[in-house]
Amino acid sequence: MADKQISLPAKLINGGIAGLIGVTCVFPIDLAKTRLQNQQNGQRMYTSMSDCLIKTIRSEGYFGMYRGAAVNLTLVTPEKAIKLAANDFFRYQLSKDGQQLTLFKEMLAGCGAGTCQVIVTTPMEMLKIQLQDAGRLAAQRKILSAQAQLSGQGSAQPSVEAPATPRPTATQLTRDLLRSRGIAGLYKGLGATLLRDVPFSIVYFPLFANLNELGRPASGEKSPFYVSFLAGCVAGSAAAVAVNPCDVVKTRLQSLQRGINEDTYSGFLDCARKILQNEGPSAFLKGAYCRALVIAPLFGIAQVVYFLGIAETLLGLPRVQP
């Protein structure tokens, strides 16, 4: 069994490389997802993903679509590395003499991976959401100011233009949260993140493993890279849509600023109840299409890098098929 021991540094490097490539490719869609999910029954700014991206480019420029990307690019390496390496570790610990895992054990390994990753995922998402949603809130304030000016033209008192709110930075947000709420401020929404990421991993990893196994050659060699990519895309999109209701609740809970006439929430159940009462069941699927488009290539790329064993090649280590 010693010759099958997992090389943790290689898994961490593979996860980091995959995360950096994936985030760079799909981050604008993730921004659209966050803004669509945060829209309530107040001032609705966007009607679809494409409408959101077009309006973002017009009002904030091309790089506005990458607002918050620096946080993701910084923390996605440990986040994806922990997720993939933890799943590999738990699968290794649960296996017996190289025998194929049962579905229950595959789900158990995925559960462990999802639980481990929230250490990094929660503060990363907390900061990213504030930066991504700042543009939507600024656009709302601009529209409200314009409407106030138009209504003020017929009144005796002149309207006052709303002052521009400075855009927050990740460093400023981190400092303010630590000062006002301590480390718990960065982990707001931890429970909701667990309720999203643990079921996601329970669905994703067993589904990927079985889909990838279908493409394995009869000779017993590892699956071709394109099979790993397609398996990652299918498993990722399926798991993403399945847990999208929890992602909507998590996004709402982690948003510190609210738009015009938007609800505030005291916890997961309160948020879910208000969404259901005020917006209907369909609100839990807001951003599901965007999330599937984000997760599919993100995990497809991750599994290609992971299963090709790029880090093992760089480090001169033998490639071990998990």
Curated annotation (Swiss-Prot):
Entry keyword set: Membrane, Mitochondrion, Mitochondrion inner membrane, Repeat, Symport, Transmembrane, Transmembrane helix, Transport
Coiled-coil zones: none
The UniProt record lists the keyword Repeat: yes
UniProt membrane topology term: Multi-pass membrane protein
Function: Mitochondrial glutamate/H(+) symporter. Responsible for the transport of glutamate from the cytosol into the mitochondrial matrix with the concomitant import of a proton. Plays a role in the control of glucose-stimulated insulin secretion.
Family statement drawn from the similarity comment of this UniProt entry: Belongs to the mitochondrial carrier (TC 2.A.29) family.
GO biological process, one term: aspartate transmembrane transport
Compartment(s): Mitochondrion inner membrane
Solcar repeats: 6-93, 101-214, 223-312
Transmembrane segments: 12-32, 62-82, 107-127, 189-209, 223-243, 292-312
Reactions the enzyme catalyzes: L-glutamate(in) + H(+)(in) = L-glutamate(out) + H(+)(out)
Phylogenetic placement of the source organism: Eukaryota, Metazoa, Chordata, Craniata, Vertebrata
Keyword Mitochondrion: yes
Entry protein name: Mitochondrial glutamate carrier 1
Organism from which the protein derives: Bos taurus (Bovine)
Chief location category: mitochondrion
UniProt superkingdom: Eukaryota
Entry GO CC: mitochondrial inner membrane
GO-annotated molecular function: amino acid:proton symporter activity; L-aspartate transmembrane transporter activity; L-glutamate transmembrane transporter activity
